[in-house]
């Protein structure tokens, strides 16, 4: 038997907590036997004194075990259970292609995703743009679609990781969100509750990233890779670029359209293709579905080219309540905004840099994102045909196309887009889409 205040005192004094102490405290978060004040105090103690790797693993696994841990054995799946998670960005539509692509290569992808908050878009919000799609299906339907289709992308259910929900809301209100240890446990407890065989982690870097610097992003990536592998899930973290919009669009319905165009081959943005392939290939390697990266990429290109990945996306949508002909006739089902109009550059030159966070906030201003949890979204609005860094532009070249519901909203977004995309006299140096892979062997 432990006392919550003694656990707080120990961490306040910079000492390491035992796994038993951490389990006791997390159980108290779940059962409400630990007060909000005590949770806030421990969060602040961890923020200032940090946790070693053993503590991080203990916190992550205790939070994972605070609720239901999914069990796939009873389904008799004939392939590995694999997934990816992103720290969030702008125009990050990867999950919509990656899930069906990995499933088409023999994996099973039970992806539990979140909604957008702040400048980053949420995967669930994109699916909410699809008429009829159930982002909160019953456990039975979720398992049925995973088994029969190979992929199901849904929202977090109430019985998964209840400790994280309470801990996170208190961290958000007490300025301890930025702790690497607590971020690691929050992200991984949700993913590990899905009982994965392997995980690819996408940690964003740059002006649209969650972490403020490359160094902070790398520290988070290393922490996640070390803790996940330490907890028994094969994991690789990728550091990927978010100094510009990842797809050529940002929003909800507009990103669904780009995902379908990617899967069918109608249009594949080169940067989006590179990051999607990098993450998906890593999932196949970790899951034992490919012998090396070249083999993984060949398999992924095959399921794109033969239409199998697009077919599975369609089956997932219809299996979760959406239209059966969604892939073939998506324009019939996706909402469209009243005003669709380009924004032009004020001067001749090159797209030199981008404040990606501000572009994400422009989508929020249009109504496509949340200022606070619970806000209602307009799924039709957003940006399309966003220029890429290095593109040559002039006063007749659109740097983006705005999808808005009113002239006032368009005007506000136009100002934001012009301010966020900086035009220079020369083209910037090209940066890689993927900066680094952090594998278990690198830790």
UniProtKB/Swiss-Prot annotation:
One Gene Ontology MF term: 1,4-alpha-oligoglucan phosphorylase activity
UniProt xrefs under SMART domains: PYNP_C
Keywords of the record: Glycosyltransferase, Transferase
Pathway(s) annotated for this protein in UniProt: Pyrimidine metabolism; dTMP biosynthesis via salvage pathway; dTMP from thymine: step 1/2
Top-rank taxon, per record: Bacteria
EC primary class: transferase
Keyword DNA damage: no
Catalytic activity, EC: 2.4.2.4
Entry keyword annotation includes Transferase: yes
The reaction(s) this protein catalyses: thymidine + phosphate = 2-deoxy-alpha-D-ribose 1-phosphate + thymine
GO biological process, one term: pyrimidine nucleobase metabolic process
GO CC annotations, alphabetized: cytosol
PANTHER family: THYMIDINE PHOSPHORYLASE
Biological function: The enzymes which catalyze the reversible phosphorolysis of pyrimidine nucleosides are involved in the degradation of these compounds and in their utilization as carbon and energy sources, or in the rescue of pyrimidine bases for nucleotide synthesis.
Family: Belongs to the thymidine/pyrimidine-nucleoside phosphorylase family.
Quaternary context: Homodimer.
Name this protein carries in UniProt: Thymidine phosphorylase
Organism encoding this protein: Shewanella baltica (strain OS195)
Phylogenetic placement of the source organism: Bacteria, Pseudomonadati, Pseudomonadota, Gammaproteobacteria, Alteromonadales
